[in-house]
From Swiss-Prot:
UniProt remark on cofactor binding: Binds 2 Zn(2+) ions per monomer.
Lineage: Eukaryota, Viridiplantae, Streptophyta, Embryophyta, Tracheophyta
Role according to the record: Plays a continuous role in plant development probably in the structural organization of compartments.
Main location: mitochondrion
Name of the gene: ATJ1
Binding site for Zn(2+) 1: 186, 189, 235, 238
Protein name per Swiss-Prot or TrEMBL: Chaperone protein dnaJ 1, mitochondrial
Length: 408
């Protein structure tokens, strides 16, 4: 029997300890925790939580959340400075939502309400014990609820942006100054979340120790998060988070030869989350625009050169653009349409190769006239006859009869 009583005492102590330090399965802490003091739970909160939020006991979680947001904005002390009762009303609304907005707590609360309706002589002690059981968690979740009102969602530390480059910028390399939206430390409070001269008071839960002990267990106090004190004020600019939306700038040195979709990383240039953690990174995805003159294929480029059909036959000269300027090329005699001429090393820089540049390919586009004058026509007809004679001669020279006749 002694052994049983000893086990029972320790089980009860463990349950009491868990309630005191706020251990709840599935609980998640908000990204920015500022341990803002909230007045203790008022006895007026004995009202039914569903009535406080103006919803039905069968209301969905979304309906409860929507009603809470509307009421919280309406009765928030910041917008009701001349209405002392608004603070009590806001606290009542917050307490109701902290219970009904959590599925586990709501289930326990509903069971309690059912019991109270069954036993007429219930003295209300169950309701008060329910509040005390969760009171240590109310301060812990206050910032999360406060953030929901003002839509201060969790911040992802890394930032991803895109930067457009022209082909010439990608080929030669350049320096770019980039501005982008980011979360930065609040200037008003220097990222503290509260005024630098904000008054502090001893934590009522741990009485300044920072730890809660219920033999044989000891753990960090969940009300003050181990600091031993709580702050009664919060920064109005950042609403206690220490973080605000702002703009950052970064200078980016882009090497020559970068390709589209390449990503450049700047460590520590992303969003800030707290003064005790490192900022996220900035990831810049490059987008190289298509060029009206050149077509790119890796480190090689292609350009078209328009020539006449007489230049294609007789040869000649043509001026073509390159990345470093225009140059004059010799057109080989007998150039065929779409024939390529290679200019070695005239392409884009290569990264990490022994050959430091790609090539430029000149594609000859042969233009044929749609109209000719009489003289040109006569010349072309004569040329055509000559072609036919040459073809017949070539054909005859290759025949068995021609070979016999020529050898006599």
């Amino acid at each position: 029997m002694r052994r049983f009583n000893w086990v029972l005492r320790h089980v009860q102590a463990r349950r009491t300890f868990d309630s005191a330090i706020g251990l709840r399965q599935g609980s998640q802490k908000p990204l920015f925790e500022r341990y803002i003091h909230a007045t203790g739970i008022n006895n007026s909160s004995a009202r039914n939580y569903y009535d406080v939020l103006g919803v039905s006991p069968k209301a969905t979680r979304e309906e409860i959340k929507k009603s809470f947001h509307e009421l919280a904005k309406k009765f928030h002390p910041d917008t009701n400075r001349n209405n002392p009762s608004a603070k009590r009303k806001f606290q009542e609304i917050r307490e109701a939502y902290e219970t009904l907005g959590n599925s586990e707590r709501r289930e326990e609360y509903d069971k309690l309400q059912y019991r109270n309706s069954d036993y007429v002589n219930n003295d209300g002690g169950d309701s008060e014990r329910f509040r005390r059981a969760y009171q240590s968690n109310f301060s812990d979740t206050f910032h999360k609820i406060f953030s929901e009102i003002f839509e201060n969602n969790q911040i992802k530390p890394d930032i991803r942006v895109e930067l457009s480059l022209s082909l010439s910028e990608a080929a030669e390399g350049c320096t770019k100054r980039l501005s982008f939206d980011a979360y930065v430390f609040c200037d008003s409070c220097d990222g503290l979340g509260h005024p630098s001269d904000a008054a502090m008071s001893i934590c009522p839960t741990c009485r300044g120790v920072g730890r809660v002990t219920i033999p044989p267990f000891t753990a960090s106090c969940q009300t003050c998060k181990g600091t031993g004190h709580i702050i009664k004020e919060y920064c109005m600019s950042c609403r206690g988070s220490g973080i605000v939306e702002g703009t950052k700038t970064a200078e980016l040195v882009i090497p020559g030869g970068v390709e589209s979709e390449a990503t450049i990383t700047i460590v520590g240039a992303g969003n800030v989350s707290s003064r005790t953690s490192q900022p996220g990174n900035l990831y810049i995805k490059l987008k190289v625009a298509n060029d009206s003159t050149f077509t790119r294929d890796g480190s090689d480029i292609y350009v078209d050169a328009n020539i006449s059909f007489t230049q294609a036959i007789l040869g000649g000269k043509v001026v073509v653009p390159t990345l470093s300027g225009k140059i004059q090329l010799d057109i080989p005699k007998g150039t065929q349409p779409d024939q390529l001429l290679v200019l070695r090393g005239k392409g884009l820089p290569k990264q990490g190769f022994f050959v430091d540049h790609g090539d430029q390919y000149v594609r000859f586009r042969v233009n044929f006239p749609t109209e000719v004058n009489e003289r040109q026509r006569a010349i072309l007809e004569e040329f055509a006859k000559e072609e036919i004679n040459n073809e017949l001669s070539d054909s005859a020279e290759g025949s068995w009869l021609y070979q016999k006749l020529s050898t006599g």
